[in-house]
A protein has these predicted regions:
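Conserved C-terminal active-site "lid" loop/helix of NAD(P)H-dependent oxidoreductases
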Residues: 232, 267, 293-334
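Conserved Rossmann-fold NAD(P)-dependent oxidoreductase catalytic core, especially the SDR/UDP-sugar
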Residues: 77, 99-169, 190
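Glycine/proline-rich active-site loop of Rossmann-fold NAD(P)-dependent oxidoreductases
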Residues: 128, 175, 187, 198-207, ...
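Mid/C-terminal beta-alpha module of Rossmann-like enzyme folds, strongest
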Residues: 245-307, 341, 345-346
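N-terminal Rossmann NAD(P)H-binding glycine-rich loop of SDR-like oxidoreductase domains
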Residues: 3-23
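Amphipathic terminal alpha-helices
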Residues: 323-331, 335, 339-357
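NAD(P)H-binding glycine-rich loop region in Rossmannoid oxidoreductase-like domains
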Residues: 50-96, 100, 121-129
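A conserved pocket-lining segment of Rossmann-fold NAD(P)-dependent short-chain dehydrogenase/reductase
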Residues: 161-164, 210-230, 234, 238, ...
Length: 357
């Protein structure tokens, strides 16, 4: 099977490439000319430089590729940006880049049998944030454990068919890309909307590890927050389960199937890193918003993309990140192997091995 992975040099993209190689697929890694290839060292990888801003150039490139080896059977579109100094960049990269990619594949007569798009749970915005009180926690896997017991579940999960109400430029751009994909003639698409993805090589969650190492753990807002995560390898497994089954015209929400409070991630990092004496601070939302606004403004003058910005503020402000993954469980036999503790332990071990901490 011939497979193209866009954004292959990125966090998720590099793991997608590794999985495809493990499955003995013929892999093309779509990268920018300036992209680091640090995590793409396998000699079996075919590299193809993609300028997603230029539909005509992509069309010529894909037409040439088709002449050489035929069309790709599967295209996984993982390229995109999660933060930027300027709002319009999200739409230029995440939406217009997707449009250029699909149009170029069509124009070159190289439409794949399956086009996998990595979207985001952020397309929904802040939904279902009204308290519902005590509730029997659902267990999508039908196994024993902490799920299935009575506990305080404040919010109902976000469901696939909920109407997206994105409240960030990032979420809006991903929703716009989805809308284009769904109406594209001849495109056999499947869409994944993962919650927060963490693991080795990822740098945003790594900032929390740096903070813990400095003996400070931050939480934001005083209203209870229900958070979900998915370890990168579990997300990748879900993607390839869809590829194996030839799934098309389907959308899947992806998490590890569990729900955590705002302190769990920091506590697990602290335990895995062996850090003692951590001060836990809860920052009021108005202070967070002010800090994000200042950082965003400063970034426009320094030319650097800040980690904190008003988009990030809206994401951190959101209280409900629960999501219903039952479709993936039923249709893809999705069984995540990593709960948060196992994933954090493996991630911290990688941080230490790579001397990030």
């Amino acid at each position: 099977m011939n497979i193209l992975v866009t954004g292959a040099s990125g966090f998720i993209g590099s793991f997608l490439v590794e999985k495809a190689l493990d499955l003995e697929m013929n892999v093309w890694a779509g990268v920018r000319g300036s992209s680091s290839r640090r995590y793409l060292q396998d000699e079996r990888i075919n590299f193809i430089e993609l300028d997603l801003d230029d539909e005509a150039a992509l069309t010529r490139l894909f037409a040439k590729a088709k002449e050489e080896f035929g069309a790709w059977d599967v295209v996984i579109h993982a390229a995109g940006i999660t933060k930027s100094r300027f709002r319009h960049d999200f739409f230029a990269v995440n939406c217009n880049g997707t449009r250029n990619l699909v149009n170029a594949l069509r124009n070159a007569g190289a439409m794949p049998r399956q086009f996998v798009y990595l979207s985001s749970l952020s397309i929904y915005g802040a939904l279902r944030e009204e308290p519902i009180g005590m509730h029997k926690d659902s267990n999508p896997f039908g196994s024993k454990g902490e799920s299935g017991e009575f506990r305080e579940v404040i919010y109902e999960p976000i469901r696939k068919d909920d109407t997206p109400q994105p409240n960030t430029a990032y979420g809006m751009s991903k929703a716009a890309a989805e809308n284009f994909i769904r109406v594209s003639d001849g495109l056999q698409w499947v869409i994944f909307r993962p919650t927060g993805v963490y693991g080795p090589r990822e740098r945003d969650y790594f900032l929390m590890a740096k903070s813990i190492k400095s003996h400070v753990d931050f939480a934001v807002g005083f209203k209870r927050q229900e958070i979900t995560f998915v370890y990168v390898k579990d997300l990748v497994d879900a993607v390839f389960a869809a590829i194996e089954r030839g799934v098309t015209k389907k959308t899947y929400l992806i998490s590890d199937g569990r729900t955590y409070n705002s302190r769990t991630f920091g506590q697990l990092l602290q335990n895995a890193m062996g850090i003692k004496g951590v001060v836990r601070l809860t920052v009021p939302l108005w202070i967070l918003r002010a800090v994000c606004a200042v950082a965003q403004t400063a970034g426009k003058f320094t030319g650097k993309t800040p980690t904190l910005n008003l988009d990030k503020y809206r994401i951190m402000k959101q209280r409900n990140w629960q999501c219903d993954i039952s479709d993936a469980v039923k249709e893809l036999d999705y069984r995540p192997k990593y709960d948060l503790k196992k994933g954090v332990d493996e991630t911290v071990a990688w941080y230490k091995k790579e001397q990030w901490i």
